[in-house]
């Protein structure tokens, strides 16, 4: 994170503390991704993706309120990592549904946009952080994510029902 030097200085964090935050994030993310996939197969992927974006965006905004190591662990690792973990499986499943013969190309466009977003947001977060402080970068990016989540709630569509819902519907109609 490009605002990490500002956070480290403001909160007096050591390299070990910063590394611990990243480790706990990856631990929670890795534990929750399979659960996100399981849930994504059974419920509306539109709402899983939307709720994930909203949850992790709100957690991002709350990161700006952190005043120490423990709060950063909770907000960045548990809340943000937890939100992101449910996004991926449902998101990639939706992309696959919408692009049958062009699935690989669609995934490549998604990944390209993802990395372009990382590049642009890195610059923008550094700029905002330098002008108004590291907390402002989290408020701004969290707010942008909330707007994105609201747009997704309105515009995103589930192309087909998750397997468990479809199976339950078929069983009821017999």
For each predicted feature, which ranges?
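Transmembrane alpha-helical cores of Major Facilitator Superfamily
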Residues: 20-27, 54, 108-116
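Cytoplasmic helix-loop-helix junction between adjacent transmembrane helices
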Residues: 75-114
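Flexible cytoplasmic inter-helical loops of multi-pass small-molecule transporters
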Residues: 154-174
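Conserved MFS/SLC helix-loop-helix module at the cytosolic interface between two early adjacent transmembrane helices
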Residues: 31-70
């Amino acid at each position: 994170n490009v605002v990490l030097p500002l956070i480290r200085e403001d909160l007096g964090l050591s390299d070990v503390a910063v590394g611990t935050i990243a480790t706990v994030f990856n631990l929670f993310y890795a534990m929750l991704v399979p659960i996100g996939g399981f849930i994504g197969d059974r419920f509306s992927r539109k709402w899983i993706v939307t709720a994930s974006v909203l949850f992790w965006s709100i957690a991002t905004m709350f990161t700006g309120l952190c005043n120490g190591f423990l709060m950063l662990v909770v907000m960045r690792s548990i809340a943000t990592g937890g939100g992101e973990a449910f996004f991926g499986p449902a998101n990639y499943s939706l992309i696959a549904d919408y692009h049958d013969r062009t699935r690989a190309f669609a995934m490549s466009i998604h990944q390209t946009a993802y990395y372009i977003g990382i590049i642009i947001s890195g610059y923008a977060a550094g700029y905002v952080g330098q002008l108004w402080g590291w907390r402002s970068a989290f408020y701004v990016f969290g707010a942008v994510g909330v707007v994105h989540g609201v747009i997704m709630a309105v515009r995103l569509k589930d192309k087909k029902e998750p397997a468990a819902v479809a199976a339950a519907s078929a069983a009821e109609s017999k």
